[in-house]
Amino acid sequence: MQKILVEFYDKENLENVFSLLSMTYDKVLFITFSDDKSNEAFENDEPLKRFIKRRAPHLEIGTVNVTEKKFTDIIDALSRAVNEKDAYDFDLTGGSEIVIAAIGHVVATSDNPNLSIHQYDIKTGSTVFRHPEYEILKREQSAPKLSVPEIISLHGGKAAAERNELYPNVIKLREGILKLFNAVKNCSKEWNTFCSIPFTEALNKDKMVITKSVENGNYMNVCRKIGDELEKAELITDIEIYKKNGRFYYEYTLNCKKEERFLYEKSGNILEYYTYLAATECGAYTDVCVSVEVDIDGLITQDNTDTTNEIDVMASSGHVPFCISCKNKAAINEHLYEILAVSKNYCGKYAIPVVVSNANNLPAIEKRAKAMGIVLIDNISDLTYEDFKRKLKCLI
């Protein structure tokens, strides 16, 4: 006797696979409809089929197509699909009222005694209902666990590159990340400018000497301010300001590990890695990745026309994805729309978009973010590292 899952195909792929991730089956039957073209959508849903084959390589995948989403048509299709020798488990999750009613009719009138139904709350990962037990079960702690690349692939994308693949021992850079963030956290505006100033670099006895052209008077002030903070933190040494060929230069020696050099290249890198480190160490997430470059068609090429987006920090707690955008300034409307679009496109409707900013957000932005379902964490320069970890942990 085979155990067969009957699943109504949905455009949200997490709903399509949640039962398969939670229980063991021999076969899955996806119910599709011609009138809403879900039959065509299923036929073209290669990300779903690839995901299922990776997670359950021996599972047989079948379909039952219904011409119209009518009560009698659904009953007829289900009745034809159900035989008397196998066990069938119907998933009600996300189903419309007419679908749920049709399943109830089939289960109640079928001669097959091995029919069951269940429903999940995808957000919490809990079992809401199961028949024939007729009981509401408490939240299960064994909700499915998905990695960040799995979540992206399930929704048709692919992680093109992850910075922590280039620097796999990010935890070994912990001290350097914390020291740099604490040095510049209260002068994020100047840090943004400092990192944008053109520079040259040279190697001197295994130390990197950086020279910035500071003809612009503001550049000189910025370099002095940031340089003082970095010098106090013992992150740079040998500061020298000099004039050559009528131009002023600000020169210093980086006092950091070679592997930490990238933290000084772009102003946003340090906030991203500080957030990544905190999310990793708070102990609440199944998987955490940083600087995740995502290709929506799932085909990574070297073609310059290949469209990709970057998610600063992405995490998963069980099956729930968190997409985190890191900003060295207050959040604005554009940031909200960006993270919402990226999270929905690459991680589905259950994704939780988050904006971490190192400034005080305006009340209007906070109100707008709440209406859009976006979580804001601002003024992180005022938080201790432990407080920041608690904030990230409370997202779950």
Question: Which residues make up each language-model segment?
Answer:
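Short beta-strand-loop-alpha-helix junction that forms the active-site gateway
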Residues: C326-H335
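Short glycine-rich phosphate-binding loop at a beta-alpha junction
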Residues: A87-T93
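C-terminal structured interaction module
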Residues: L92, I98-A101
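Active-site beta-strand-loop-beta-strand hairpin of nuclease catalytic cores
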Residues: M314-C323
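Anionic group-transfer/hydrolysis microenvironments
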Residues: T93, D312-M314, K327
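Short glycine-rich anion-binding loops that position phosphate/pyrophosphate groups of nucleotides
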Residues: K11-E12, G94-S96, K329
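Long, low-complexity, Lys/Arg-enriched
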Residues: M1-A87, A101-N309, H319-V320, Y337, ...
